[in-house]
Amino acid sequence: MNKVALITGASSGIGMETAKLLVTKGYTVYAAARRVERMQELEKAGVHILKMDVTDEASMVDGVNKILAAENRIDVLVNNAGYGSYGALEEVPLSEARYQFEVNIFGLARLTQLVLPKMREQHSGRIINISSIGGKIGEPHGTWYHATKYAVEGLSDSLRMELKQFGIDVVIIEPGAIKTEWTDIARNNMLKVSGKGPYKNLVEKHARMYERADKSGANPLVVAQTIVDSILADKPKTRYATGGGAKMILFMRRILSDRGFDKLLLGMMK
């Protein structure tokens, strides 16, 4: 019997590439997203498509129930759905900040709650949480986004210890700069929210840095390969930094003081 995986945020980028790759490894793959009209390519590859919004309780419950009704098992959950909306903390509406938490942390946590009873029953399973190097470092104008990713890191580290007794692994993936829609969304929101007020000067420099990073960013397939490697590993690492200078940036964060790293990052914004 094939193992069964659920991947969220699979209508593009990392999620889509992970679904395409994992189905070639003999997994039964369910790819979930809001924009299912963009997922015909996955369907042709043999991936099952689910319409799911990780901010909607009924949508998540229905999706998991459909998988369990069809397969009676779930072996892997890849919590990939994510949202980044940048802007100075002073200027980002709290409604927007809350929405980022709904997508990036509460949706992730709720979907994990929904799959855990079956994984415990199986005494096996793997939860793959897509964090970011932004769960280990901060940037100006990314206060709310980084807060969500720091939360993903803390949640995952605690959950890993809770679930060890049930034979369930928890893995954190920390991508660096990747060529996906995420960068454009974050940059455009940052300019819209904070590109004309008191933060304008640094925001414009930050936006230019993102343009450069987008051109040199890694292909989403690099991260997808790391995710699939973590799924196939007999004993996965607890976290994987991957793509887009991730390992170098995290190394610099470890060796520099807080202010030293601030200086390095601000110096890249020009």
Predicted features and spans:
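Residue(s) in the substrate-gating loop at a strand-loop-helix junction
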Residues: 132
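Conserved glycine-rich cofactor-binding loop
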Residues: 11-12
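Substrate-binding pocket helix/loop in short-chain dehydrogenase/reductase
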Residues: 88-89, 96-98
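A glycine-rich helix->loop->beta "capping" turn
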Residues: 66-79, 85
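C-terminal beta-strand-loop-alpha-helix "lid" module of Rossmann-like NAD(P)-dependent dehydrogenases
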Residues: 164-214
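The beta1-alpha1 cofactor-binding region of Rossmann-like NAD(H)/NADP(H)-dependent oxidoreductases
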Residues: 52-62, 94
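Active-site helix of classical SDR
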Residues: 112, 148-151
